Regions:
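C-terminal motif of bacterial Sec signal peptides marking the signal peptidase cleavage site
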Residues: 16-18
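Catalytic cores of phosphodiester-bond hydrolases, prominently lipid phosphodiesterases
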Residues: 22-89, 93-380
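Sec-dependent signal peptide recognition
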Residues: 2-11
Length: 380
């Protein structure tokens, strides 16, 4: 009888605590995109200005020179060496080519105005931070940057998805000083220019976009993208490995123009930073880390925030914004300092401030929206 009772006890244990426990059979690949957290880089393409250009900017806009004193290595290095899985690329409209070939700020530092860079003569979107004075970049064209991402992705097909945030820019020196003349005048990002973003992505990733996660992939046959993501509709990590997805950094009129004619982003490639309550809302850009981010994350939105800005934290060593960004559950925590500024070793103006996930993980289970099963495990 005792042996029979033992068998019954074992059987009941299996029934109630083993075989039917779905959590025990869950794997990391079953986590959804909104259930992880990664480190991102800000203005990821950017090379710091030369000393001479920095000094020129400081002579008329010292605060701007202070804010711009950072740079990044190649995207491939960011992905492989530092585990970055979210990047940001600024693009300017240049349908005829040559708009940014001349770097007119060079006139004031004794450098040639004509860049001599052939890629800048070709038609298409250009990658830079600011015409004439802050133009140094690892990738002159958007297509060059996309190829760099795709090539790395093809060589590392098991990577968790990379999110690329795109800012459509129109800024120039005239934006700072309207009375100035003779400098580059960027073009407006109208509907044609916004369509060019999608077209150039397709030119690199193919018309079928097999490697790209699009709003249509998430929305399916539903009328509202937001309703899908608020009901657990993001794809799993396993379904998304080796893929890329894109977001539009801009709000306001630029965002509205991108959405116009594409309800719930039907047919579009970029997720937009749209307001909760709209049919296209899925990705939120909340640059200032606050505790309220957790509320949006727990609802199902994917959020990008910043751990630092304008070099302030790297100079002061203040880790408060970084720590709040990480604990908020924002899926993308963007920084200029996934490695400390090298000048910290030789200058009192800089600290060893840096941003990484606990354990230097590439990705971790989200502290707010995760399942609770993999908090101590690295995800990649």
């Amino acid at each position: 009888m005792q042996q029979i009772n033992t068998y019954i006890s074992i059987y009941l244990s299996l029934v109630f605590f083993g075989c039917d426990n779905n959590e025990d059979s869950m794997t990391i690949d079953d986590l959804k995109l909104n259930q992880i957290q990664v480190i991102g880089s800000h203005n990821s393409y950017r090379i710091n200005t030369t000393v001479d250009m920095h000094n020129l900017i400081a002579s008329f806009q010292p605060d701007l020179a202070h804010d711009l004193d950072y740079g990044h290595p190649l995207l491939e290095t960011q992905f492989s060496q530092y585990g970055i899985r979210q990047i940001e690329i600024d693009v300017y409209h240049d349908p005829e080519g040559g708009l940014f070939y001349n770097q007119r700020g060079n006139l004031f530092i004794g450098m040639p105005v004509a860049s001599g860079i052939e890629e800048l003569l070709s038609p298409g979107l250009k990658v830079l931070h600011f015409p004439d004075i802050d133009y140094r970049t690892h990738y002159y064209t958007f297509i060059d940057a996309l190829h760099a991402v795709k090539n790395w992705s093809d060589q590392n097909p098991n990577h968790i998805p990379i999110f690329i945030l795109i800012e459509a820019k129109e800024e120039s020196l005239s934006s700072l000083y309207p009375s100035l003349s003779g400098f580059t005048q960027p073009l407006t990002f109208d509907n044609t220019a916004l369509d060019a973003i999608d077209a150039e992505i397709r030119s690199v990733f193919g018309e079928n976009l097999d490697k790209v996660i699009t709003p249509d992939d998430i929305r399916g046959d539903n009328e509202s993208l937001e309703s899908v993501i608020l009901n657990g509709g993001w794809p799993t990590i396993g379904e998304s490995r080796g893929k890329i997805y894109f977001g539009l950094d801009n709000g306001g009129a630029t965002r509205d123009a991108y959405v116009s004619g594409h309800p719930a982003l039907a047919g579009r490639i970029l997720f937009t930073a749209s307001d909760p309550g709209t049919s296209e809302a899925a990705f939120l850009k909340l640059n200032t880390p606050t505790e309220s981010i957790s509320d949006f994350v727990s609802q199902g939105y994917i959020v990008r925030t910043r751990a630092d800005a304008d070099t302030e934290e790297a100079r002061s060593g203040d880790t408060g914004p970084r720590d709040l960004a990480l604990s908020s559950g924002a899926q993308f925590v963007s920084t200029d300092y996934y490695v400390a500024d090298a000048r910290a070793d030789t200058s009192e103006d800089w600290t060893n401030y840096s941003v990484s996930l606990p354990g230097n993980f590439i990705a971790r289970e989200n502290p707010v929206s995760g399942s609770g099963n993999f908090f101590d495990m690295e995800i990649e």
